[in-house]
């Protein structure tokens, strides 16, 4: 009798490197039209781009107004949202080409040397400091119609409402000349890193083929390689959040540096659905704590759980706050494995310095790859490991 390999039994057989003929499995997109993405599972989403805002330069009153305005929108927004904060090294190609033209046309040797030194400085800053930040909110279609016209009308209303509330609290949204091309270019940034800097002029007829990476290696435990770009995926564990956080607690994730993408999944639960669960949990933990000695370690855990339940119930009933589940995922990208590991360590340390516990999605990198796409689709296993309840 042949004895099976224990590693294969526990972890499964090694995944094969995905080549150009099979990478369509990484593209859950069926079509893009009318500013809407249709997914393979029949769902529809759209993406709203929001311009960056330096929150720290605002006065205390302005900061509170921004937070309260955003919270007001969350009360009437779709019950499920995805917020994407993407940072990339600044694109300096056009500027460098202009400097090169100046350099070639300059006759004075001293001026040529100054232009060359400027080019070196710009290149250094771009590699080490300069980044571009882009923010997106992914909105779902929550209606029940199968008619595309009705879907478009409802999605348009959802986007317009979001624009109205966000701009009322000081956040400027972007209206693109062609929303379909914007969505296609956005997805290319996640699925086709080799096309970075190439501006599409139209939507390809076969959208899945156009979005399919030329190569994708998902065989590694702790990273992936897509068209030569190395990526590692992290998540904040469910118990890895501090008990309380101040204003703009998530801002450092968006400022972590080039090659870092932070994704936040939000799911609102109705009061009618969540209040009974919170009450039952408090009653259950109260009955358990009576059987536990106050010197045992789990006594403190039960006492904290009871206090948290009572606090949430009070805030929901008396302060009008909403109950949400949040999942925080991050991807780290680099041109080589050494830089990837360095950036990954820096990101984990950043999270730890703020009281968060970041874990790498080992043996789930392929699932994390799909969960980071701006399509409001998170893997069930990753969602379970990273889900945390919060209040607005």
Show which residues each predicted segment covers.
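Extended, folded cores of ATP/NTP-driven motor/assembly subunits in large transport
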Residues: 2-392
């Amino acid at each position: 009798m042949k004895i099976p390999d224990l590693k294969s039994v526990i972890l499964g057989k090694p995944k094969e490197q995905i080549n150009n003929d099979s990478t369509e499995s990484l593209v859950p997109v069926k079509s893009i039209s009318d500013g809407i993405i249709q997914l393979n599972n029949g769902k529809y989403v759209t993406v709203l781009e929001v311009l960056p805002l330096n929150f720290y330069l605002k006065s205390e009153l302005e900061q509170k107004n921004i937070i309260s305005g955003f919270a007001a929108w969350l009360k009437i927004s779709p019950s499920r949202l995805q917020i994407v904060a993407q940072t990339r090294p600044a694109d300096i190609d056009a500027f460098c080409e202009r400097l090169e033209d100046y350099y070639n046309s300059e006759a004075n040797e001293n001026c040529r040397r100054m232009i060359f030194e400027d080019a070196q400085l710009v290149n250094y800053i771009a590699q080490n400091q300069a980044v571009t930040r882009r923010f997106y909110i992914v909105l779902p279609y929550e209606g029940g119609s199968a008619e595309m016209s009705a879907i478009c009308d409802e999605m348009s209303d959802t986007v317009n409402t979001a624009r109205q509330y966000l701009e009322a609290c000081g956040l400027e949204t972007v209206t693109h000349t062609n929303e379909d091309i914007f969505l296609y270019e956005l997805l290319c940034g996640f699925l086709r890193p080799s096309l970075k800097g190439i501006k599409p002029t139209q939507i390809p007829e076969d959208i899945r083929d156009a979005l399919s990476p030329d190569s994708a290696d998902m065989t590694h435990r702790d990273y992936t390689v897509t068209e030569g770009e190395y990526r590692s995926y992290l998540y904040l564990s469910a118990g890895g959040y501090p008990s309380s956080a101040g204003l703009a607690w998530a801002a450092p994730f968006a400022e972590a540096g080039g090659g870092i993408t932070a994704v936040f999944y939000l799911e609102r639960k109705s009061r009618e659905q969540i209040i009974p669960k919170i009450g039952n949990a408090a009653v259950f933990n109260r009955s358990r704590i009576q059987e536990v000695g106050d010197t045992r370690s789990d006594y403190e855990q039960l006492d904290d759980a009871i206090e948290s339940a009572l606090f949430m119930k009070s805030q929901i009933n008396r302060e009008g706050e909403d109950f949400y589940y949040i999942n925080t995922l991050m991807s780290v990208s680099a041109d080589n494995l050494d830089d990837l590991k360095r950036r990954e360590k820096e990101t984990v340390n950043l999270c730890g310095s703020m009281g968060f516990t970041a874990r790498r999605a080992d043996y789930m990198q392929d699932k994390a790859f799909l969960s980071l796409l701006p399509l409001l689709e998170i893997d069930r296993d990753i969602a379970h490991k990273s889900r945390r309840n919060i209040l607005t």
